[in-house]
Amino acid sequence: MERVKKEAAIVTGASSGIGYAISQKLSVLGYEVFGFGRDFEKAAWQAADNVHPIVCDVLDTNKLCTYIKQITAQHPVHILVNNAGIGYYGLHEELSPDKIKKLVRTNLETPMILTQQLLRHLKKNAGYVINISSVTANQSNPHGCAYGAAKAGLASFSHSLFDEARKYGVKVVTIFPDITQTNLYRNADFREGDEAESYLLPEDVAGAVEWILSQREGVIVTDITLKPQIHRIKRK
């Protein structure tokens, strides 16, 4: 299912993990991929001719919007993947106000701003907004209250946005991954189990994105939950 190369896909949090895997998948599918990340030096980033890493902190709204204007001036944007995320774990009273603000801005505010900046273009191109949420959006999340709340807010935004924009051909999809082998949990006191069946890989989420894009025009799956076969986590 190869797309015309000039169609653009924008992916946040693209320097590693899920965002990196999605960027590589979209590159193979023929999109002109613009991946936003804070540090591509530490990542095993493999840039093809149609993959463009952009060093930018998504919390720098002015810089982010400037890049978006430059991209949309040269390419029809077909896909936006809001993937950048950050998690802080522990008792809620032990989170600082600054950490709570950063978490909400990264996981919820920035996706809403990026979508606002690109929505007119996505309507014109009958494009996709793919939001990477979390299974914690749909369940109790003790020791991760703020993270779960922000991801639940992202899911709510997705559902309302789809109802608002569907008549223009815009597809809005939320992916809810369970524990995935990424750096997201580096601040947590737990990690995935040792068995390969106890966690997801970033490539699993990228595969879900490919499946979303493979559906015929007129069909949209709005929510996808990905879970490992075995539920097992380990304390660090």
Where are these regions (language model features)?
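Substrate-binding pocket helix/loop in short-chain dehydrogenase/reductase
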Residues: 91-92, 99-104
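Residue(s) in the substrate-gating loop at a strand-loop-helix junction
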Residues: 134
